[in-house]
Each structure stands twice: as C-alpha cells, then as structure tokens.
Design a protein with these regions (language model features):
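Flexible loop/hinge segments at secondary-structure junctions
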Residues: 1-109
Length: 109
C-alpha cells in the first residue's frame, strides 16, 4: 500500500500505519511525504493507493476521488500583548490576510 501527500497528515498516517501493521503484519505500507496537491495527483494517476490532503479537495479532484476525513485541526491567530485588540472577528482576520487592511488602527474603528 502506498500513501502519498500532505506533510501535516504524515504523522497521523504513521500512527495509523503502526496500528494497522499490528493486526496485519504481512502488509507493506510506504508513506511518501510531499504536499496535498501531489498526494491528490498521485491518487488520481494511480501512483499511490491513498492520497493525503490537509485541505478541502478541489472540485476537479472530487470528480476523480472520494474524500474521507480522518481528523480536523485548529488554527489560531496570536498577537503581541502590546496590541490594543482583545479579539478578532473572522471578517477582521480575512481582511488582514487578504491585504485589505495593513494597520491595527484599521481594526479598532
């Protein structure tokens, strides 16, 4: 069994491999770490049996593959304690990371 793709999924897949091999010791599992797109491409073209992605599958990938979630993770935005803001809305995070705003004072208006 060849598994390929996301570097952030790889540690979880290594643990799943260990558990699987305990009950199926005669199976060979190779995990190839790269990125989500490479994993999906490999699954589509048949160079791997399982592709790993740490993002939602693209529509074009879903035409060829079936996605199965094995885990969810959280992402935090952290600011310095000197920052005047005590919290950020999802919309504020969006405008920061899209470059629509470039100063903290824009967030306090």
């Amino acid at each position: 069994i060849t598994v390929a793709g996301s570097s952030s999924v790889t540690p979880i897949m290594e643990k799943l491999k260990e558990a699987y091999l305990l009950i199926n010791p005669d199976v060979t599992i190779e995990i190839q770490m790269s990125d989500s797109t490479a994993g999906m491409t490999a699954a589509i073209d048949g160079t791997c049996d399982i592709g790993m992605a740490s993002r939602a599958l693209k529509d074009s990938e879903l035409e060829e593959l079936t996605g199965i979630s094995i885990a969810l993770d959280g992402i935090a935005v952290i600011v310095n304690t000197e920052n005047p803001l005590e919290d950020l809305t999802s919309e504020q995070v969006r405008v920061i990371f899209t470059g629509e705003t470039t100063t903290w004072t824009d967030m306090t208006r």
